[in-house]
């Protein structure tokens, strides 16, 4: 594994506002982290924030070749070399943390917790006004709608 003191993870909402301002800020913060000794960056998937962070880190990798980009995936825990190669075309390493691949609907939450546990620094994009996707749950023949933000859960965990 990696030395935790050199590891940073990115966690944020699926959709982001003020993209241009945020891109500049991500780039600036990431470069400061690199200059302070961070060189392993962990990414989740399925969010605009992660995509923006990946783009910034990838651009910075041309100036700082020691950067390692690691995808923390939530599925395919027993992926073979052929499947992993699809991930490794864009990332330097790919990890499915223990238990995450079988966590079902909690996979994102468990993946984020694993990323936080492996990192000494977490860069969050958390908007208190963000409206998470509402999901319908049926329990004991009672239908309820529940809105949970995985980013808020990760933020509270960190």
PLM-predicted stretches and their roles:
Residues 1-157:
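Acidic/glycine-enriched connector segments
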């Amino acid at each position: 594994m990696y030395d935790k003191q050199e590891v940073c993870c990115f966690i944020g909402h699926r959709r982001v506002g003020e993209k241009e301002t945020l891109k500049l800020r991500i780039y600036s913060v990431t470069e400061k982290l690199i200059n302070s000794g961070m060189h392993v960056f962990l990414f989740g998937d399925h969010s605009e924030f992660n995509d923006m962070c990946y783009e910034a880190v990838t651009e910075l990798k041309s100036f700082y070749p020691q950067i390692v980009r690691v995808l923390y995936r939530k599925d395919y825990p027993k992926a073979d070399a052929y499947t992993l190669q699809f991930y490794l075309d864009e990332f330097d390493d790919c990890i499915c943390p223990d238990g995450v691949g079988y966590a079902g609907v909690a996979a994102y939450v468990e993946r984020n917790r694993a990323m936080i546990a492996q990192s000494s620094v977490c860069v969050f994009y958390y908007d208190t006004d963000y409206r998470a996707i509402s999901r319908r749950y049926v329990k004991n023949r009672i239908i309820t709608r529940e809105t949970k933000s995985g980013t808020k859960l990760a933020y509270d965990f960190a």
